[in-house]
Regions:
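GNAT-family acyltransferases
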Residues: 1-101, 114-118, 122, 131-133, ...
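Conserved acetyl-CoA-binding loop-helix of GNAT-fold acetyltransferases
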Residues: 104-118, 137-145
Length: 176
């Protein structure tokens, strides 16, 4: 099922056939460099894909969605919305991950802008956060390009990350 489309991308629910390209993405150390748990095995990827397929039990409207090229259907990565507790406050994180062969094309920014619009217009969310690991300059640039600003730091079992945030109330989202 399609969640949203942008000029170049389709974000859709994951399908079982996405396992192979998702595993290719997850086993790449460059792509997973800023993930505290590093690369993933095939079994770990399969388990995560099952979570994507079943959705979040408490927030089924949220999730990470397969991000594919609109014209070819080529799997490019994943982008979406995840529930988090930050400092005891429930938040929704905008998360994105694109195949390194397509880095530098603005695809993560385009996907993130589409998800921001979906969060504001369809889900009626009032605010989003983005959790950026220290040193991840590319992810930081995407967060800033979609209008997020540094709000502080968050520490949990995964480590310390920078929290970028953006209100969705009364704000337009740039088109790509």
């Amino acid at each position: 099922m399609i969640i949203l489309e942008t000029a170049r991308l389709t974000l859709r629910h994951f399908e079982p056939t996405d396992l192979a390209p998702l595993f290719e993405l997850y086993r790449d150390p460059d792509v997973r460099r800023y993930f505290p748990d590093g690369t993933r095995t095939l079994q770990e990827t399969r388990e995560e894909l099952e979570w994507f397929l079943n959705g979040h039990p408490d927030r089924p409207e949220l999730g990470l969605w397969a991000t594919v090229e609109r014209t070819t259907g080529t799997f490019l990565g994943r982008c979406g919305l995840l529930p988090w507790m930050i400092g005891g406050v429930p938040e929704v994180e905008l998360a994105y991950l694109i195949d390194k062969r397509r880095w530098g094309e603005g695809l993560a920014t385009e996907a993130a802008q589409g998800v921001l619009r979906h969060a504001r217009d369809t889900l009626r969310l009032q605010r989003l956060v983005c959790l950026v690991m220290p040193g991840n300059a590319a992810s930081l640039r995407v967060a800033e390009k979609v209008g997020m600003t540094l709000e502080g730091e968050h520490c949990d079992e995964f480590g310390t990350c920078h929290v970028y945030a953006r209100s969705l109330l009364g704000h337009a989202v740039a088109e790509t």
